[in-house]
């Protein structure tokens, strides 16, 4: 949780679950959600090499990685996409949100297109057992081809478009929105992280 006195994040107490968050423009509130989930969180710059993260994973220093939200066109972030491909190949548990959601899809070989008619704001999102209101601010949409490699776990109620995914045969989850700590997405990611 953010500590206003020190200007830093407090580490989760007695946490044996550590994750690195790749910062593409991460929100403090989302980092707080990860800490509330019981993770010790280390934020690393977007320029961090996948080999460093993979070595930390193999050494047992971290149990997973989070690809954060942020601004910009995911299609032009070719260096980041190449690094994420290596993370995918390492089988490290990945949670991707916002911009990270699109980058993970691109790294998995699926096309991401700009939406012609953008609708920002609060949207009802239907999961397996719940309907939640979430803030959607994405200008992009993942191709329907994603269904060949991922299961859709959450959709927008208004238009049935996919907004959260679980990749098949992988330890990878992603969502267009920032999930809260008690959401099924975060709970499943917590189970993946050792």
Question: Which residues does each PLM region occupy?
Answer:
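RNA-binding accessory domains that recognize and position tRNA/RNA substrates
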Residues: 1-61, 74, 180-194
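Residues that mark the start of a beta-strand
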Residues: 18-20, 40, 93, 133, ...
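Short loop/helix-cap segments at secondary-structure boundaries that form the rim of catalytic
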Residues: 32, 53-54, 103-105, 144-149, ...
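Generic structural signal for residues in well-ordered beta-strands
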Residues: 41-43, 112, 152
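Cysteine-nucleophile active-site neighborhood
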Residues: 56-57, 62-131, 169, 180-192
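Conserved hydrophobic/aromatic beta-strand scaffold that supports enzyme active sites
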Residues: 122-124, 164, 174
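Catalytic beta-strand/loop cores that center a nucleophilic Ser/Cys/Thr
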Residues: 129-170
């Amino acid at each position: 949780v953010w500590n206003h006195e020190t200007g830093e994040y407090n580490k989760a107490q007695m946490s044996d679950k550590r994750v690195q968050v790749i910062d593409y423009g991460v929100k403090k509130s989302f980092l707080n959600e990860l800490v509330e989930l019981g993770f010790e969180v280390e934020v690393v710059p977007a320029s961090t090499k996948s080999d460093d993260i993979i070595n930390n994973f193999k050494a047992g220093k971290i149990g997973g990685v989070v690809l954060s939200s942020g601004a910009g066109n995911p299609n032009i972030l070719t260096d980041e996409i190449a690094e994420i491909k290596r993370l995918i190949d390492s089988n490290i548990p990945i949670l991707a949100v916002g911009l990270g959601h699109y980058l993970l899809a691109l790294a998995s070989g699926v096309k991401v297109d700009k939406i012609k008619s953008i609708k920002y704001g609060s949207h009802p999102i239907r999961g397996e057992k719940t309907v939640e209101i979430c803030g959607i601010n994405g200008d992009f949409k993942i191709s329907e081809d994603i269904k060949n490699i991922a299961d859709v776990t959450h959709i927008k109620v208004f238009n049935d478009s996919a907004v959260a995914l679980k990749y098949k045969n992988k330890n990878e989850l992603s969502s267009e929105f920032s999930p809260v700590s008690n959401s099924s997405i975060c709970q499943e990611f917590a189970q993946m992280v050792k």
